[in-house]
Structure formats: structure tokens, C-alpha cells
């Protein structure tokens, strides 16, 4: 392949998908069947979606190869994080509290275990005051920065922040979260993917049975995954058209 040919080929778009806050075997199976890439287990005891380490390990054993278990922690002790991750084969960590870069680094066993760091972005116009570039630089050891809306508690609030206020160029892999549904994820992917290295999406409340936190709806899971794939197809079409433009 010549350099000229390489320049005109469109980049392939495939958005990775994580479903978070699972508590039941049937929901894990439904997510895997739908084709998700990662499953999140909440180990924060104050969350209505909380599961024990033992339960997370039990559910994670249902996962096939190449579907990653993600353990969500909020201001947990380093020793307990390391022990929990060691109990769930193939797990990576997600830090969703007030953990400093140094604390994340230590809890990841100095980079031996990949981790995500959540950024809690204020809702509405207040989001413009959040310095994502500095946050991404401070947590540059993280595999990705997860973008969530700042709400009471830590995550799973079902609210979306203003995506248009994000910086135009973030030197990091991003995970878009917060208030996503099958109805808005295409818009979210379209707005955010051009701003970062790669984009993944993370959903919890948007695929739940109404009023039942931690209980997922298989139809909503499948609808969400289908919407993400439509977004990928749309971006691929746009990239192809751009390459054909003189």
C-alpha cells in the first residue's frame, strides 16, 4: 500500500460498549449476547447497584473471552482494591470517587493493572468550567478517562452533561457516560468522538427496568447496542465520503 493510498482510506469506527451496575446472571448473559465489550460491577456499598466482591467474581465467571469485567470503586482503601481485583479474573479498576493520581497508581499496583478514572462534569453551562485537559494530563496513567455527570452520589444518576462544552482536542481515550440511552447515544458519539483518541460508551440506568436500579432490561440493552452500531456506520459513511471529496 502506498502512502497516498493509506491517507485516503477512511479510519474504521467501532465504539466499545460497557454496561455497568449489573447484579443478575440473566442480565450479564443478555449483555454478552448483545455484543458488549465490558461489564461493570459496582463495589461501592452505598450504591443501590452494589454487589460484593464474591458476587462480582461469580458473575464475572460467566463472561466469555474478550469481554472485560470492570470493578467500580469509590474512595476505597488501596489494599481492598488490590484484593478485589485479584479475586476477579481479568478485571480492571474504575475509580469513581476522589482518588488522586498517586492513589490510582498505587491501587493499580503501579501500573500493573489497567484502570479508568471518572471525571465528574457539572451539568448545564457549569460544565464549561471543568478543565478536562488538565484532568486528563493529571491522570495520564489511566487507560481512559470516563466522562460522567456530576450528581449527588457517585454515578448512575441518569443525567447527561453538555457534550458540546468539551474541549475540541483531548489527548486521551475517553469513555462517554452519564444519562445515555438508545435515543441519544448516536448524538453523543457524533459530538464526542472527533474530540479524542478513541471513544467508548458506558451505560447503567439507561438500560434498567424503570424504578429498579440494578435490574436491566434485555430489550433496552439490545436497542442501545444497535444504536451505537448505527452511529459507527454513520461515521464510517461520512469518513468514506470525505475521502472521495476532491
Could you tell me what each predicted segment is?
Residues 28-34, 137-140:
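Alpha/beta enzyme core
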Residues 43-47, 60-177, 181-185, 208:
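Conserved anion-binding
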Residues 39, 93, 145, 196-197, ...:
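Hydrophobic residues within beta-strands of alpha/beta enzymes
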Residues 1-20, 241-245:
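N-terminal amphipathic alpha-helix/helix-capping segment at the start of soluble metabolic enzymes
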Residues 38-55:
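Glycine-rich, proline-tolerant flexible connector loops at the mouths of alpha/beta enzymes
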Amino acid at each position: 500500500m502506498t502512502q497516498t493510498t493509506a491517507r485516503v482510506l477512511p479510519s474504521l469506527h467501532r465504539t466499545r460498549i460497557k454496561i455497568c451496575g449489573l447484579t443478575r446472571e440473566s442480565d450479564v448473559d443478555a449483555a454478552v449476547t448483545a455484543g458488549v465489550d465490558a461489564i461493570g460491577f459496582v463495589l461501592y456499598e452505598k450504591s443501590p447497584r452494589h454487589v460484593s466482591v464474591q458476587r462480582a467474581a461469580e458473575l464475572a465467571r460467566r463472561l466469555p473471552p474478550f469481554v472485560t469485567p470492570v470493578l467500580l470503586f469509590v474512595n476505597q482503601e488501596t489494599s481492598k482494591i488490590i484484593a478485589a481485583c485479584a479475586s476477579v479474573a481479568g478485571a480492571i479498576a474504575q475509580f469513581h470517587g476522589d482518588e488522586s493520581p498517586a492513589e490510582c497508581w498505587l491501587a493499580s499496583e503501579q501500573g500493573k493493572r489497567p484502570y479508568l478514572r471518572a471525571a465528574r462534569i457539572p451539568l448545564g453551562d457549569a460544565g464549561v468550567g471543568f478543565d478536562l485537559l488538565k484532568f486528563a494530563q493529571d491522570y495520564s496513567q489511566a487507560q481512559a478517562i470516563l466522562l460522567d455527570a456530576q450528581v449527588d452520589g457517585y454515578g448512575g444518576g441518569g443525567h447527561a452533561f453538555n457534550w458540546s462544552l468539551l474541549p475540541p482536542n483531548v489527548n486521551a481515550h475517553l469513555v462517554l457516560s452519564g444519562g445515555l440511552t438508545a435515543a441519544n447515544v448516536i448524538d453523543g458519539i457524533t459530538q464526542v468522538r472527533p474530540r479524542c483518541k478513541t471513544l467508548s460508551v458506558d451505560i447503567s440506568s439507561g438500560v434498567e427496568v424503570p424504578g429498579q436500579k440494578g435490574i436491566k432490561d434485555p430489550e433496552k440493552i439490545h436497542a442501545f447496542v444497535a444504536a451505537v452500531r448505527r452511529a459507527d456506520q454513520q461515521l464510517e459513511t461520512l469518513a468514506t465520503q470525505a475521502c472521495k471529496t476532491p
